[in-house]
Each structure stands twice: as C-alpha cells, then as structure tokens.
Curated annotation (Swiss-Prot):
This is Proteasome-associated ATPase. InterPro entries: AAA+_ATPase (IPR003593), AAA_ATPase_domain (IPR050168), ATPase_AAA_core (IPR003959), ATPase_AAA_CS (IPR003960), NA-bd_OB-fold (IPR012340), P-loop_NTPase (IPR027417), Prot_ATP_ID_OB_2nd (IPR032501), Prot_ATP_ID_OB_N (IPR041626). Pathway: Protein degradation; proteasomal Pup-dependent pathway. Belongs to the AAA ATPase family. One of its GO terms (molecular function) is ATP binding. One of its GO terms (biological process) is proteasomal protein catabolic process. ATP binds at residues 273-278. Residues 583-584 are annotated as: Docks into pockets in the proteasome alpha-ring. The keyword Cell wall biogenesis/degradation does not apply. Consists of three main regions, an N-terminal coiled-coil domain that binds to protein Pup and functions as a docking station, an interdomain involved in ARC hexamerization, and a C-terminal ATPase domain of the AAA type. Residues 16-91 form a coiled coil.
Amino acid sequence: MSTSDGVPSTGGRSPEELASQVRLLEDEVSDLRRRLTESPGGSRGLELRLADAQRSLAGVTSQNERLAQTLREARDQIMKLKEEVDRLAQPPAGFGTFLARNDDDSIDVFTGGRKLRVNVSPSVDLDTLQRGQEVMLNEALNVVAALEFEEVGEVVMFKELLADGDRALVIANADEERVVRLAEPLRGDTIRAGDSLLLDSRAGYVYEKVPKSEVEELVLEEVPDIAYESIGGLAGQIEQIRDAVELPYLHPELFKEHQLKPPKGVLLYGPPGCGKTLIAKAVANSLAKKVAAKTGQEGKSYFLNIKGPELLNKYVGETERHIRLVFQRAREKASGGTPVIVFFDEMDSLFRTRGSGVSSDVENTIVPQLLSEIDGVEALENVLVIGASNREDMIDPAILRPGRLDVKIKIERPDAESARDIFSKYLTTTLPLHADDLSEFGGDRDACVGGMIRATVERMYTETEENRFLEVTYANGDKEVLYFKDFNSGAMIQNIVDRAKKMAIKDFLDHDQHGLRVSHLLQACVDEFKENEDLPNTTNPDDWARISGKKGERIVFIRTLITGKQGTEPGRSIDTVANTGQYL
C-alpha cells in the first residue's frame, strides 16, 4: 500500500518491526538455501536404502517360492505313494464272460467255472456289452469294466448251425462233437462247413474264424501273368486248349443253341519240362482277358494251383476234406460268373488207379471224392478242372472217361521247328551280342540271333555219333539207339541258354570279351548233354522210359553210349529188375 504522493506505506508498523521482519525473512531464506544444498545427499541415501530393501524382498520372495514348490512336490509324491499303497492293498480283480442281460439290469457272467448273476458298475454302459465279451469283476464280483473278446483258445471245425441261429455244432479233437454259442463277432457272418473256429471251451463260445494255412495256400491264387505268346513250340496244343476252354465262356449262347455242354476238364500229359504247367497258367490269364474284352469290365479269373502231394494227409479223411474245401471255394467264386480253373499238378500222385497201391489204399477214397465233385449232385458251373501228369497211364480210368476230363492234350517233346520257336523266346535281339558274331551278319542283330538259333538247333538235332545217348533193349530182343533230341524239352532249352549267358559273363570278366557268342551256345549244348548222362540211372528202365515219354514195348535194358564228362569214362550198362510194374 502507498500514499497519495507515492511514498510506500508501513501499515502503521514501526521501522524496528519492519527490520525484525526482514531479518526473519533473511534467516528463512538462508535456511531454505542450506536445506536446498543438503537435499541431494539425503535423497541419494534414501534411494540406496530403498534399493537394498527391494533386493532383500526379492531374495525372500524367491526363497519362499522354492519352498512352496518343494512342498507341492513332496505333497504330490506322498499322494502317489498313497495311491500305490492303496492299489497294492486292493484284492485281485477277476475276469468273466458276458452271457446275457436281465430285466433288473443285472447280468449273467461265466467266471471260474461258475455261472453267476452279478451287478454292474454305473461306469459300464450295459447297451454296449456283447455276448461273449470279456468283463472285469471286483472283489465283490461286480462288473467294473468291459474288455475285448478272447483271442486264444482251442481250434475246432464248424459242422452246422442249429435252428435257433445262436448255437452251432462243432467237431473238436478226436472227432468229439460239441454244441457251442456264437459270440457277437460271428453272428451274421457267413460260416461254411469245414471252417476252423476259435473256441473258449470254458465259456462255450466260439469267437472267430481261423484260417488254416494248409487249405488257404491251395485256394484262390490270382491268375499268373503268363500269355500264350510267351510259350514257344506248342502252337497246336494251345489252339486245342483254347477251343476247349475259351469258346464256352466267350460264346455261351452258341453252345446253348447247339445244346452243347462245355467240357468239365482237360488233361495235359507228356514228358517232364515240356510246358504243361505253363499252358495251364496261360489259360487262366487268357480267359480273364477275353472275358474282359467281351464284357467291357475288368476281367478276373481264379487259378487254384493244387499240388497233389500237398493234399495228402496221414489222417484218414483229411485229404478228402481238403478236396471238398477246394471245390467248395471254387463254386463260391464261380457263382458270380467268374471263371475258376482248378489245376491239379502231378495228378498221378493223387488220383492213382484204385487197387494199385502197395502200402495203402488211400486212392480208393480220394478218387471217388474227385469224381463226385466233378459230376456229382452239385453242378460245377464256371469251374474247369485241368490236370497235368507225365504218367497218365497211372491215373484212374474213371477220371479220364468222357464227361469228366473230356479233352486230353498231349504235350510232345519239341521237334527242330518247335525248338527254334522256343529258342526265340529266350534269345532276343536285346541281349548283348559279341562283335565278331555281329560282323558275320553285317551288324544285323536279327540275322545274328537267327543264325545262332539255327546253329544250336542243328547241333542238338543231328543224328551224329556225338549225339548218341542210349541204347535200349526191348522185351522182344529188339534194340534201338536214342539220341539227345529224343529227350529234349523246353526246360532243357532254357537251361542251355542260361548256361551260354553265364559263359558270356565269365568271358567278359576273365578276358574282357563282351557279348554272347554262338560258341557259348554250342558248348552249353555239350555240357547239358554230358550232365544228363546220369539221369537214366534207375533200377527200373521201363518206368523211367514211361516218365520220359517213351511209350511202347517194355524196356528191359538200358546202356549209355556217351563218354563221361572228362571224355575218358566208357559207356556203362544199367541192370534191370524182375518186377517192372511198380512206379518209382
């Protein structure tokens, strides 16, 4: 405040008061300045103490967390140990087989040789339980869990299904017949007579079909991928079998119009190694392709390769049962119009003339079984029986009569023309040929291969001194010289080519001579002939000759005319025996 003339007013206070007030203010300012000066140092100390406190807190917190984690782990370990103790202290659980469900939601089970009615835990869904299913029982014999079906047991043979459809008659060991229940997996499934089933003999349930390897191996083999074009030297025989097999399937309306029934069977007979089995396999393959071409759908046929010795069984009736099973499966597959070929290899070993057995008369029941299958009460539609044998004279005549094996085709040993055809299947222009042999034909691979084949066939089929093999003496005293060409076969030709290829490989490795030569083939012929020197070594020349395809007058004596493999061993004679009627 000021006066009117501009002089400051003192507010009625004296100068001493004002001076005192000024001093107080100055002291306050000084104190503030001092405190301001000291303030940064104090703040720093507080910050340090605060940081120390925070570090201590963090350490205590971490220690507390570790302690809490240790306590939790200890608690979990204690709980696990307690559970283990409780588990080990529990009484053992039992197992049973579910039989039926009752109206009060209890169930009947079979356990420990007893049939019991027990209660079920709420955790088990009654609607999912199936007949024959395994269940778990607690100490109070209450069901606490549902398990799978039994997987082990006794193998029995199915005979027939009973009228109620829930039970079956089976044959156990020692031909014991039993009535058993069908478990749920078998209900509604197709079960055929002769099928093997898995039986739980305690509960009386059969659970599943068990494939029997000795039967399954013989049944339903897919068609081999062998075409007629792969077979050489048998054009006439192939034409015969195509007429007998393919025409009825490709033109059934013509057969029906002419009231002609297709043949039921074909017999392929002839010496070993001449292509009987090969033709049978090609029949199935060709038939499938022809059916596919006619219908426009994927062609399929089945080739059941039945090896005679595999069917034989020491137990009475087992061989006949296997034959029935084979034809039963064949009928099932053929019922849909699919052609099925049942091929009996080495037919003479299984269906020998009845009464010709020396140690047993097993053929007395096996032969009638086959006859009843071929033309019995059940029709054999779309099923063709093909038999192969090199001793057709030993097959029972009832099998060979018309109406059973209608078509009989002889697979002869190849002549020179057929041998050239067979060689052409194995000697092709894709093989590596020696440069010297190629140069003789101006580099023409086709001409070179043709020349090799001609030279090899000429070496095999000429009636020269070095090609003489045997001198046979007949029962009437006549003698005849047989050459190697009389014992040639497609298998021998293949073996000769394989020998020549091996020689070519060895020449390349030893002498760096690359490619097949005609000299390899000629040397392979010599080695093959020498190796066959020991083949007629038998105590029964007549039977050996029949197997080899030499029919006619009975042979009583054989003498080899070739030298040994080293070229120094003289020819030798082979004695005969008095009884020449027994088959070796």
